[in-house]
Amino acid sequence: MADNESSEKKRKKLSRRKFLVRGGFGTLGVLAVGTYLFRNPIRRTILKKVNSMDIEYLGSTDNPMLWFELGKDNVVILHSPKVEMGQGTFTGIAQMAADELDVPFENVKVVHATTDTGNIDQFSTGGSTSISGLWQPLRELAATFREMMKIEAANKLGVSISQLSVKDGVVSANGESLTYVEISEGVTDWTIPKKPILKDISSYRFVGKPLPRVDLADKVYGAPMFGLDAEMPNMLYGAVVRPSKIGAKFISATTDKAEKMPGVVKVVSEDDFVGVVAESYIEAENAKQAIEVVWETPDNLQQDEIVAMMTVGNGTSSIIQKQGAALEGDDVVQMEFRSPIGAHAQIEPNGVVAYVEASKATIMISTQVVGITRKEVSSRLGWDVEEVNVIPTYLGGGFGRRLHTPHAVQAAVMSKAVGKPVKYIFSREEEFQHDMFRPPTHHILKGSLNEKGLLSGLEHHFVSGDVGNNSALLPNVVPTILGADVGAIRGAFIQYTGVPNHRSVYWHVDLPFATSWWRSLGLLANTFAIESFVDEMALKAGKNAIEFRLAHVNDDEAGKRLKEVMSTAGEKAGYSEEVKNGRAMGFAASVDAGTPCAHVVEVSVEDNNIRVHKVTVVLDPGLAVNPDQIRAQCEGCVIMGMSAVLFEQMKVVDGSLTPTIYGPYEMALMKHAPREIDVVLLQGKDTPGAVGEPPLGPIGAAIANAVKRLTGKRLQSMPLKLT
């Protein structure tokens, strides 16, 4: 029913200035403040705002026709600007839309918005912002759509709007009824009300219910829905030659042998890459191996050099949080912690199909940044963005990996060279060796106790490589303005603001390999360090770990929510600091993107291996749009966090990142999963909050704290190993 021409015009009216104003993202909104940003107190205020991830939806919210269309049987098709990567966003937004549209939940069909036919988010899908960011605009759009139906129904039925009632997508008055589809027939000029009236949340039928996933059947039956499934008629296959050494620069390539191999259509040589296009995937991969490339490589790096590089005191520093005086004196306790390089290791490797025609390019891809993918392809082709249509697919795991899509550009270049669609799939080796890794970190924690056994001071000094810096999501000026990487500082703030003297100091080091976004960003490593140290201070003070923490949390709104999460976790888990039957409990808590979370774990040691038996998760996500999906996210965070904390690490060996395949890259297996994950949800506010990443934060420290009580050993480096 949407008027595509008028919709496109309305989308183009969203000027750059309006985009920045609507964005609400502190990083963008502060640009007008100018030189005041370079004053440290203001910087720290902005960093705190950015760290809360209070990001509004960055896209058009004034035209329901970009979002909704009507299908047969009165089905409403919702074009989602957020991609589905297993987090359940499609289900949550279907619930939100159904309530305000006043249609049955099963009558809402959610599809990915393409850049040609729907509204797209100019930011990304990530940062735990999909449901929280769409909560207000999507409901308003749905309410507007409902009111548009009522206006036209009143015209067709010859009654006033006040005489109408709406139920299940049917508008009625005086014994006559019209479905939304019947109302829309023949209407070309819609009246869009300026201010929709939202329903009272208490009247919602679907929000707050544990409804089944809308994509469940497709996944069970194996529908072709992922990037690797994407196909186009007459499709060829591409492969790209990549260096095995860190920092290698392309010099030249000899392609004669590859050009003569079976199935090869063309070898595409560019200044920045060499690719092969062939009739099959295997033929493209085989020909790639036959290309002789000359690389300029630096001296072979080794792991110990990376460790030395990633040490507090190296690089540039910025104070991101400061209250009171710095810690000095003989009574100051100091400990160090480290986390390793981490891979995304998502199940589905990156894949893309690109078809570049004379004046139109079509890209089918697993991407978390639909708009950025479009801009990068159009820029490389030298075209206007309107000439590139990006069709996002379902993602077989995102975790931040698909915030980078240079392979879309490479596939487009290869397609243009051969005049046919080209499918480019990463091999597993490519996926591991050329990942955008989670950077390694080093932390120094300092603390002191007063005569009452309470913290008089707490400091966190840490170093990290790039997370948000140098990514397409953030303008290059942002690091200069903020003085810190907005991703690296996630979880780095001292949440125990009742400590009179506390500070957090960030150090940045440029690493020789690519690092970037990884699920929860800096939260996992920062929480591991801070919460392990706080637990050590509780032991030193001779106090219960939970009670010790509660004594240092303020009673503002955020503090009260954190306290409630901590207390509830202890109660639900039956937290005890006694070792019973060879098992011990550990506790940790964190606040991420405004969502507090606490874990209590129960562990044992079997053959010098740490075994996690039970995890109790207490999360306060605010209003739970779909409680079952939130529990699933908590369970997923526990398993992913356990895997990272107990097993995963990449290393630099002779100038290369290794390993490059599952198996040697250790990950948690089914046998390592806890027998029980108990999730308790609280509601400390009346709107949805972040969910996809906050539950990942506490797991590492909780395990380490349990191991300390069980064995007496303080494990200070991930992955946690007793030998």
Please tell me what each predicted stretch does.
Residues A2-T723:
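Cofactor-binding beta-sheet edge motifs in enzyme active sites
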